[in-house]
Amino acid sequence: MDHSQCLVTIYAAAVLLGLRLQQGSCQHYLHIRPAPSDNLPLVDLIEHPDPIFDPKEKDLNETLLRSLMGGHFDPNFMAMSLPEDRLGVDDLAELDLLLRQRPSGAMPGEIKGLEFYDGLQPGKKHRLSKKLRRKLQMWLWSQTFCPVLYTWNDLGSRFWPRYVKVGSCYSKRSCSVPEGMVCKPAKSVHLTILRWRCQRRGGQRCTWIPIQYPIIAECKCSC
């Protein structure tokens, strides 16, 4: 490790230990299927287990369903068959590490506005060079950055498109020093998809209806 990298590590540790971070307990949530991402409000769906209420092959006409979706169909987040580039649960830790190496978006103001001083020598206090300051800021940002991790979710045959890309926040690592804070959902958006709905009044009648399906759009480090 060269002298510059060593200084970055020392200063970063000192800065993080000096930050005032609130700690809090984490609450776990029980989901019913199909479950939107993490702890966002669940879609109020009651699914009867009897396969008689499943759509038949004639009800899965892609041309017709596409027309019902209109401009709501988003190929980046929806698919009729399971995409080959899907990620498993075991891949999330690796993806989280990869995305944190190059944080996206704008650098948080509380990190961008930090000033660093060389106070290692008693009685002396000098502002660090711009290059070293930038390295420290990037290091802090990578440690506290909470990327959204996207995976494909199978909603079952009663939803179209059947596969939706949902977001999650990786909470198996702490995003603070001292440890205690984790990445949690901070913002959500809604996708419009179709749900196969059956009613028994006056004989069984089934049709596709549009529903709003929430997915995580932003994660933040919090208690």
UniProtKB/Swiss-Prot annotation:
Disulfide bond sites: 146-183, 169-219, 175-221, 198-206
Pfam families: Noggin
Keyword Secreted: yes
Annotated Gene Ontology cellular component terms: extracellular space
Residues carrying covalently attached carbohydrate according to the record: 61
Keyword terms: Chondrogenesis, Developmental protein, Differentiation, Disulfide bond, Glycoprotein, Secreted, Signal
Gene Ontology biological-process entries: cartilage development; dorsal/ventral pattern formation; negative regulation of BMP signaling pathway; negative regulation of lens fiber cell differentiation; negative regulation of smooth muscle cell differentiation; osteoblast differentiation
InterPro entries per the UniProt record, alphabetical: Cystine-knot_cytokine, Noggin
Localisation: Secreted
Main location: secreted
Its biological purpose: Inhibitor of bone morphogenetic proteins (BMP) signaling. Controls somitogenesis by sequestering the BMP-4 activity which in turn differentiates distinct subtypes of the mesoderm along the mediolateral axis.
Complex and partners: Homodimer.
Annotated family: Belongs to the noggin family.
PANTHER family hit by this protein: BONE MORPHOGENETIC PROTEIN INHIBITOR, NOGGIN, NOGGIN
Name the UniProt record assigns to this protein: Noggin
Species for this entry: Gallus gallus (Chicken)
Gene: NOG
